[in-house]
Structure formats: structure tokens, C-alpha cells
Swiss-Prot record:
It comes from Marinobacter nauticus (strain ATCC 700491 / DSM 11845 / VT8) (Marinobacter aquaeolei). One of its GO terms (molecular function) is proton-transporting ATP synthase activity, rotational mechanism. It is found in: Cell inner membrane. Belongs to the ATPase delta chain family. This is ATP synthase subunit delta. Keywords: ATP synthesis, Cell inner membrane, Cell membrane, CF(1), Hydrogen ion transport, Ion transport, Membrane, Transport. InterPro entries: ATP_synth_OSCP/delta_N_sf, ATPase_OSCP/d_CS, ATPase_OSCP/dsu. Its main location: membrane. It is a peripheral membrane protein. Disulfide bonds: none annotated.
Length: 178
């Protein structure tokens, strides 16, 4: 996974810079998200792995998956990826693009696992507290995991903050066991 991200990073950075220059970050974000879904499809993976197809043909077939004619810049980007045998990296490129966009917009996407459903008021208080602490606009996604017993687990990117009762019990058990 880290290797794929390393390979995808220069492409994501280049396309993000180009999108900024064109004032088209939102359009590129949407196009890359769709392209990432297409690239993740098993049939498409099989086509991309077919050694009997030229890289140009693979890019053309890939472009045909879009409902509308592609802007020339996106078509050229797909062709560059195809020529470098990197079309399969589109999910990673899209994810990195979204991280660059979030950084630009000073926003962060957090996933919160809780032991019980949070009310709208509790969610808003959590968003306000995290926004103040992180100095960013917070987009919150919550899931319920009753095995946590209580507390929360906060995830964003590579950062995980485990403030759950289950996590605290596990840390105590490790400390007592050593």
C-alpha cells in the first residue's frame, strides 16, 4: 500500500497543481473519484493487465467509461498514466488529490467510532471541539461499535486516537502482562 502511494504521489501532486492553476479543483476531484471507481472494477483491472492491448488503447477504453466526452487535460492525464503503466494507481491518486484539497481548504475528514449513537447536538459539540483543536473545518463520519464499551476512537489518515474503554482495558492488560 505504501509503495502504491509513493508511486502515485508525483502524479497526484502534478494533477493537483494543474487543477489549481485552472481553478478546476472540484471538477478534477469529481473526475478522479469516478476514474478511481472505474480503475477498481475487476473487469477494468483485467483489461489494464492485458498485454495484448497497447497503452494508448487502454487509455481510450478507460476514457470510454465516462458518460461525457473528457476534457483534453483529463484525456492527456489518462494517456500519461497509461504510457507509464500507472492507470491502476488511480484510486491512490484520487485519495492523495483529496488530501491535497483538504489541506488547501483547511479541512479534515474524521471517522469517529462510538459505543452508542450520538445525537445531533453531541455530534455538533464534537465537531466544534475538534475544529477548534485542529484549527480546521471538520467533516465527521460516525459509526457505532458496541464492543468499544464506552468512549470513542477517532481516525483521520494515519492518525488513530483510541479513547475507548476497550482500548484502555487492552493497554492496562499489556502493562500488567509485562
Amino acid at each position: 500500500m505504501a509503495e502504491l502511494t509513493t508511486l502515485a504521489r508525483p502524479y497526484a501532486k502534478a494533477v493537483f497543481d494543474a487543477a489549481q492553476d485552472q481553478n478546476a479543483v472540484d471538477q478534477w476531484d469529481q473526475a478522479l473519484a469516478f476514474a478511481a471507481q472505474v480503475a477498481a472494477d475487476q473487469e477494468v483491472k483485467n483489461i489494464l493487465a492485458n498485454p495484448g492491448l497497447s497503452e494508448q488503447r487502454k487509455a481510450e477504453l478507460f476514457a470510454e467509461c465516462f458518460e461525457e466526452p473528457l476534457p483534453e487535460a483529463l484525456r492527456n492525464f489518462l494517456l500519461i498514466l497509461a504510457e507509464n503503466k500507472r492507470l491502476a494507481l488511480l484510486p491512490e491518486i484520487s485519495a492523495l488529490f483529496r488530501l491535497y484539497r483538504a489541506d488547501l481548504e483547511k479541512s479534515v475528514h474524521l471517522t469517529i467510532d462510538t459505543a452508542f449513537d450520538l445525537s445531533a447536538d453531541e455530534q455538533q459539540k464534537l465537531i466544534d471541539a475538534l475544529s477548534k483543536k485542529l484549527e480546521r473545518k471538520v467533516e465527521l463520519e460516525t459509526t457505532v461499535d458496541q464492543s468499544l464499551i464506552g468512549g470513542v476512537i477517532v481516525r483521520t489518515g494515519d492518525l488513530v486516537i483510541d479513547a475507548s474503554v476497550r482500548g484502555k482495558l487492552a493497554r492496562m492488560a499489556r502493562a500488567l502482562g509485562s
